[in-house]
Amino acid sequence: MTALNHWQPSADIKNHLKRAKIIAKIRQFFTERGLLEVETPVLSEFGVTDLHLSTFSTEFLAPFGEQSKTLWLSTSPEYHMKRLLAAGSGPIFQISKVFRNEEAGNRHNPEFTMLEWYRPHFHMHRLINEVDDLLQQILDCPPAESLSYQFVFQEYVGLDPLSAERSELIEAARKHNFMAEDNEDRDTLLQFLFSEVVEPQIGKERPIAVYHFPSTQAALAQVSPEDQRVAERFEFYYKGLELANGFHELADAQEQRHRFELDNQQRQKCELPTREIDERFLAALEAGMPDASGVALGIDRLMMIALDCEKINDVISFAVDNA
């Protein structure tokens, strides 16, 4: 097919109409609960240090002969939204385009739509309940099940992820066709076993919230004060899709800097370019971000379930190969 006649949208117009109604319902859900809708930049002077995220960049050609500078396309509005929290915004939500320079396929498009919201003074389980409320309202689905990472890992892998020996994890991974080296990183093994063994077996009949991921996978979440082995982080799964990723947010600027530095050390080990640390974000934490929980939810995947579609292309206007 030539570019000349490859002009039709990826999704049917009927799905565009249904999508618009669902977006309106999402906005109504949050405005009725008193959250402020915000807009933040999709271009930033800072990328992200996360080892597992590949970021698009562009060059800003500054006027009047000034030196051009690299700008990064947002992988999430998280840092900017937390700066708003620190400035006193109160509870906020955003529906925005985000970009990840990764695969395109049935469940992925490098440009996609994300719903992200933050709740000052909410603990993790209270936010889990609110995500559950939203899913029930939008998808008309049963209430979510809520189980710990440790429990579901033991249930389906047969090992305790918090205490198993690395050799046991290597053996389990090899049974599932992962070519694990003898010195394989523990988190790599846990992530493989969770994604390949656990995820396909959970959330089939109703959504499931998996909480208390290992503290080594805390990202921007607080470590649990009750059990230092786990982080106050959760993810939602339903019908074979990872839908949402949430945290009881880390507000300690010094600890966050340390984690960013560890990210860059890992990047060097993997022969990946390091990323400049977002000093504006850290300054906001230093100034005092309120205790809060936040979550990011993939709108396009939500639409796939709501519209009973197998491919992400069926719920977005133009996929990357047709943009």
UniProtKB/Swiss-Prot annotation:
Gene3D superfamilies: Bira Bifunctional Protein, Domain 2. InterPro entries: Aa-tRNA-synt_II, aa-tRNA-synth_II, aa-tRNA-synth_II/BPL/LPL, EpmA, Lys-tRNA-synth_II_C. Keywords: ATP-binding, Ligase, Nucleotide-binding. GO terms for molecular function: acid-ammonia (or amide) ligase activity; ATP binding; lysine-tRNA ligase activity; tRNA binding. It comes from the Bacteria. GO terms for cellular component: cytoplasm. Substrate binds at residues 76-78, 118, 249. This is Elongation factor P--(R)-beta-lysine ligase. It comes from Haemophilus influenzae (strain ATCC 51907 / DSM 11121 / KW20 / Rd). The gene is epmA.
